Curated annotation (Swiss-Prot):
This is N-acetyl-gamma-glutamyl-phosphate reductase. Belongs to the NAGSA dehydrogenase family. Type 1 subfamily. Pfam families: Semialdhyde_dh (PF01118), Semialdhyde_dhC_1 (PF22698). One of its GO terms (molecular function) is NAD binding. The active site is at residue 154. GO terms for cellular component: cytoplasm. GO terms for biological process: L-arginine biosynthetic process. It is an enzyme of class 1 (oxidoreductase). It catalyses: N-acetyl-L-glutamate 5-semialdehyde + phosphate + NADP(+) = N-acetyl-L-glutamyl 5-phosphate + NADPH + H(+).
Length: 334
């Protein structure tokens, strides 16, 4: 059994991870940690997340001694804020742990990126260079050898899974950037109380227009520029991305179909829809990404749907664990 600790276990993603680790036949839960100043320290995780009652009732421990915690673990899941992950990861890695970071701290290898989009200077360039981007369907070979996996963001997951088959097969017009409009539920903002994510205050609205940190993440790993506009929706969980593209000259519907089927026929977490478009209801509380598309003339619209807390975070992290240690890819997920 691989001893597994979750850092930042009090949040929505941490709770999902705790349940997955509990269900996994080859993982054991060695610790649920929160920060020293967390108001939740000492509480049972099931006190915060009632669905875990009688299943995972362990107490949330303050992370006081990082080196000691590292010595007691094989696998670390960082469900922490970006700068917290940045500061913690190296200690776990230097103690030989395999780290799966759900923050953005190690996703993009571009000079100046972290100071511009995350507000801090990256201090661990060597680990940033070694980090493997954990888009499970597209990077399995590298994930299987990695010590540090940077689990993608929720919007980048939905966007890249929809676009990568088209970009790889060179089916898109390179002179016109794909336009991504994506809407997320309020759990994407985390568990901490905020007026902007309060149910009575949320109204469908774009945010981060032209400057959201996920735009350069998508572009960096997709290999082409995009226009990305996120929206906040008044529902709990899920992401729906609607992507408008222009096809390269002469591309046929058959080529598009073949590109998606070649990419995803053997990937159980991606479901290709025929004659229908994805909807959040079908992926909510599942590890799946549903993809549908329609062609009209030289334009193609692709739609993808995921659960932002699962395929957009915790279940993708678990997919990466399964790939890294040679377990079936959906172990503990269905």
């Amino acid at each position: 059994m691989l001893k597994t600790a979750i850092i930042g276990a009090s949040g929505y993603t941490g709770a999902e991870l705790a349940l997955m680790v509990f269900k996994h036949p080859h993982l054991s839960l060695s610790g649920l940690y929160v920060s020293e100043n967390s108001l939740d320290k000492g509480k049972a995780i099931s006190e915060l997340h009632g669905s875990l009652k009688g299943i995972v009732d362990e107490a949330l421990q303050p992370l006081v001694n990082v080196n000691q915690a590292a010595k007691e673990c094989d696998v670390i899941l960082l469900a922490t804020a970006h700068e917290v992950s940045h500061n913690l990861a190296a200690t776990f890695l230097e103690n030989g742990c395999v780290v799966f970071d759900l923050s953005g701290a190690f996703r993009v290898k571009k000079e100046g990126f972290y100071s511009e989009f995350y507000g801090f200077e990256h201090q661990y360039e060597a680990w940033l260079d070694k980090a493997v981007y954990g888009l499970a369907e597209w990077n399995a070979e590298a994930i299987a050898k990695a010590q540090l996996v940077a689990v993608p963001g929720c919007y980048p997951t939905a966007s890249q899974l929809a676009l990568k088959p088209l970009v790889k097969s060179e089916l898109l017009d390179k002179n016109q950037w794909p336009v991504i409009n994506a809407t997320s539920g309020v759990t994407g903002a985390g568990r901490k109380a905020s007026l902007t994510s309060s149910f009575c205050e949320v109204s469908l609205q774009p945010y981060g227009v032209f400057n959201h940190r996920h735009q350069p993440e998508i572009a960096a790993h997709l290999g082409c520029d995009v226009i990305f506009t996120p929206h906040l929706g008044n529902f709990k969980r899920g992401i729906l991305a609607t992507i408008t593209t222009k096809l390269a000259k002469g591309v046929t519907e058959k080529e598009i179909q073949e590109a998606f089927e070649t990419a995803y026929t053997q990937t159980p977490a991606v479901r290709l829809l025929e004659n229908e478009m994805p909807k959040i209801q079908s992926v909510e509380k599942t590890p799946f990404c549903d993809i549908g598309w329609k062609v009209q003339g030289e334009h193609l619209i692709v739609v993808s749907a995921i659960d932002n807390l699962l395929k957009g975070a915790s279940s993708q992290a678990m997919q990466c664990i399964n790939i890294r240690f040679g377990f079936p890819v959906l172990t503990a997920l269905i």
